[in-house]
Swiss-Prot record:
UniProt name for this protein: Universal stress protein C
InterPro entries in alphabetical order: Rossmann-like_a/b/a_fold, Universal_stress_UspA, UspA
Protein's organism: Salmonella typhi
Intracellular or extracellular location(s): Cytoplasm
Keyword Transcription: no
Keywords of the record: Cytoplasm
NCBIfam families (UniProt xref): PRK10116.1 (NF007512)
Function: Required for resistance to DNA-damaging agents.
Main location group: cytoplasm
Family designation: Belongs to the universal stress protein A family.
Xref: Pfam families: Usp
Length: 131
């Protein structure tokens, strides 16, 4: 099957390089576009008592995420069409990006690394209307 736009959902982890390499191996033969999406970390999850520093911490975490995506794209040896940093429910953002940017393949890794989440793995399915 020939894809035209591949969206890769990555986490800020070393495994994302392998995920992007797989996407590039699919995209390169057909010159498909490749875009990246990731979740921004929310500092409120880490410390609810440091309210005055939250905005600064949020900005630093966002910048680190941007830098990771830039470095990931540079090491891919393939042009990255767009990068998206989402917050909230990732599946909703993926669906919105797919609809708006005509994505026809989504590649995801495991964003949840706890033992319990691996043992009780589940998936959500959202369907986009056919074009």
């Amino acid at each position: 099957m020939s894809y035209t736009h591949i969206l890769v959902a990555v986490a800020v982890t070393p495994e994302s390089h392998q995920l992007l390499a797989k996407a590039v191996s699919i995209a390169r033969p057909v010159q498909a576009k490749v875009s990246l999406i990731t979740l921004a970390s929310d500092p409120e999850l880490y410390n609810q008592f440091a309210a005055p520093m939250m905005e600064d911490l949020r900005a630093v975490m966002h910048e680190e995420t941007e830098n990771f995506l830039k470095m990931l794209g540079e090491k891919a040896d393939y042009p990255i069409e767009q990068t998206f940093i989402a917050s909230g429910e990732l599946s909703q953002h993926i669906l919105a990006v797919c609809r708006k940017h005509h994505v026809d393949l989504v590649i995801c890794g495991n964003h949840n690394h706890s033992f319990f989440s691996r043992a009780s793995c589940s998936a959500k399915v959202s369907s986009a209307p056919a074009r």
